[in-house]
Curated annotation (Swiss-Prot):
InterPro entries in UniProt: Asp/Glu-ADT_sf_sub_c, GatC
Organism: Metallosphaera sedula (strain ATCC 51363 / DSM 5348 / JCM 9185 / NBRC 15509 / TH2)
Skewed-composition ranges (Basic and acidic residues): 63-78
Gene that produces this protein: gatC
Name the UniProt record assigns to this protein: Aspartyl/glutamyl-tRNA(Asn/Gln) amidotransferase subunit C
UniProt entry tagged with the keyword Nucleotide-binding: yes
Pfam families in alphabetical order: GatC
Superkingdom assignment: Archaea
Catalytic reaction(s) noted: L-glutamyl-tRNA(Gln) + L-glutamine + ATP + H2O = L-glutaminyl-tRNA(Gln) + L-glutamate + ADP + phosphate + H(+); L-aspartyl-tRNA(Asn) + L-glutamine + ATP + H2O = L-asparaginyl-tRNA(Asn) + L-glutamate + ADP + phosphate + 2 H(+)
Length: 97
């Protein structure tokens, strides 16, 4: 199914994404979106008859068993931390100041 990327579609997408684009940005996004959708159309053209569906990329992968191990000591954990105080990591402020 070919989707026509036009001004109307772009304005709908802008509204849904709660963004406002300039005319130049809209034209750039239209070109980019057209390329992306063309790639998906190429995938649709593939003959996948006889190919088993893959539900998860790791379904046949080999994972190591989840076994408890010795954790890092506090000193080792804080060794490369740029800011710390009283044995705790100091991170950036996320509220206000």
């Amino acid at each position: 199914m070919k989707v026509q990327v036009d001004e109307e579609l772009m304005r709908k997408l802008e509204k849904l994404a709660l963004i406002s684009l300039t005319d130049q940005e809209r034209q750039e996004f239209m070109r980019d979106l057209t390329k992306i959708l063309d790639f998906f159309n190429k995938i649709d053209e593939l003959n996948l008859e006889g190919v088993e569906p893959m539900f998860h990329p790791l379904s046949t992968g080999k994972l190591r068993p989840d076994e408890p191990a010795q954790p890092l000591s506090r000193d080792d954990a804080l060794a490369n931390v740029p800011k710390k105080k009283d044995g705790y990591i100091i991170g950036p402020s996320t509220i206000g100041g």
